[in-house]
Regions:
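A short acidic/basic microdomain associated with nuclease active sites
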Residues: 42-78
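N-terminal amphipathic/basic-hydrophobic helices that include classical n-h-c signal peptides
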Residues: 1-25
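Charge-dense, extended regions
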Residues: 258-319
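Catalytic cores of nucleic-acid endonucleases
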Residues: 27, 44, 48, 81-284
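A short, highly charged nucleic-acid-interacting micro-segment common to nuclease
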Residues: 21-42, 62-65
């Protein structure tokens, strides 16, 4: 927790931080984050673990691409010139998402080198539910419009179960800590920029704050929770797989999103045939699957789902 900091660095960043507090970096925060960040200004005094500290640096860590886990970085000093780093990850109390734009790169940063195994173990654990899903929608069904053909399923991390294709991630306590803290982040996100200076491990959070009603810096300090403690009390992380569909009447799909499970469409004996692929999580994206599907639809003279019938459908997963 305690670190040694060269006084020159602290003095050198002071003016820079004052400029940044009112600048464009603040625009990256949501309203609640911005308000909380505004409480943690240079010179603010607070008590922590029975000692009084004064903030000598406070800002949002940034990097060239993506985001660190730390939302608010605080460097503070006590009367013995001992410095302490507090690195807060802020989460809204009612937020369901932990990660909603999962890519292979992001998965590795969350789960480490075994990320593919982690995701495949999770999706195959509910393989029977995937087998029950409709793939071709000749008619509107529940929330899926007529004309949709499924390309695969995106992968999201949640605080709770969400939908039919959802379940608890198979993770150790240490892996859950890694997800919340960002221990597996790439170097540019771990060693993020704070007030214009690269600070080692500034992007790796050590506290989590889930209370947006705080009104003072002391309340922030009092209500933040060590990530290890938070994980002990909330050890579950859930995943949800959300369908990416090709809308045949519009000839569109919602972007080139990485897919945790893909539908490998092909043509066999004059019929459009699907096969679900679980062992290439997030390595195949929506564009590739859509282009393959469209190629076989063209070969079979299928323009939209109105053209699909018993003669050219190689699956009964049609509604």
């Amino acid at each position: 927790m305690y670190i040694r900091t060269q006084r020159a660095l602290v003095v050198g960043v002071s003016a820079v931080c004052k400029n940044i507090l009112g600048g464009s970096i603040m625009g990256d925060f949501g309203d609640a984050e911005r308000r909380i960040k505004g409480l943690m200004s240079e010179g603010t005094v607070f008590k922590f673990q029975g000692r009084q500290y004064r903030m000598i640096m406070s800002d949002k860590p940034t990097c060239s691409k993506g985001e660190p886990k730390t939302d608010i970085y605080i460097l503070a000093e006590n009367d013995k010139s001992e410095t302490i780093e507090i690195k807060i990850s802020y989460k809204k109390e009612n937020a369901d998402f932990i990660e909603n734009k999962m890519s292979a790169e992001r998965a590795e940063q969350l789960f480490g080198s075994e990320w593919e195994v982690v995701i495949e173990n999770s999706t195959t654990a509910i393989k029977d539910r995937f087998a029950e899903r409709m793939l071709i929608y000749r008619n509107r069904f529940k929330r899926t419009n007529k004309g949709a053909i499924t390309l695969g399923w995106k992968f999201e991390l949640m605080n709770k179960n969400s939908g039919d294709l959802s379940g608890e991630m198979i993770l150790t306590e240490e892996q859950v800590i890694d997800v919340y803290a960002g221990n597996n982040l790439s170097d540019d996100k771990r060693n993020a920029s704070v007030c214009g200076n690269i600070i080692p491990d500034s992007g790796v959070a050590n506290y989590i704050l889930m209370d947006e009603s705080v009104k003072t810096a002391q309340e922030v300090i009092d209500k933040m929770i060590p990530i290890q403690e938070y994980v002990r009390n909330h050890p579950e992380i859930y995943f949800a797989c959300k369908a990416l569909n090709y809308r045949t009447f519009e000839e569109k799909w919602d972007g080139n999103r990485p897919l945790s499970v893909q539908v490998d469409w092909s043509a066999e004996d004059g019929k459009l045939v699907p096969e679900l692929v679980f062992d290439r999580p997030l390595q195949v994206k929506g564009n590739e699957v859509a282009e393959r599907l469209i190629m076989y639809m063209n070969k079979l003279h299928i323009k939209n789902t109105d053209d699909i019938n018993d003669n050219n459908a190689g699956t009964d997963r049609i509604v």
